[in-house]
């Protein structure tokens, strides 16, 4: 189920130019990744705050917690840094997250640029440590 479902989502994203989450909704919202992650983490006994933060990193609500803000920002920045399913996957920073963090779009662009300058070195260092 999951491999075929995942491929259907990627195909839909590519055809429609939408996000992974939007593709999940458009294809019936069966087993969306927020719900699946929440269920897996509940079984892992990682704590309620982390379960809820991961389970709401796209549906952040009006007053997201600090952890939700961190996860949401990291998720969107990872797309900006080239770690998305598709090269042109839309980036959707939640206004509530940016507001709570006191960030403007230009701040996010600056953060992305600083991260992209150092990221290759960080990845190389990590790979040296784990190998």
Give a label for each model feature.
Residues 1-131:
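Metal-dependent nucleotide-binding catalytic modules
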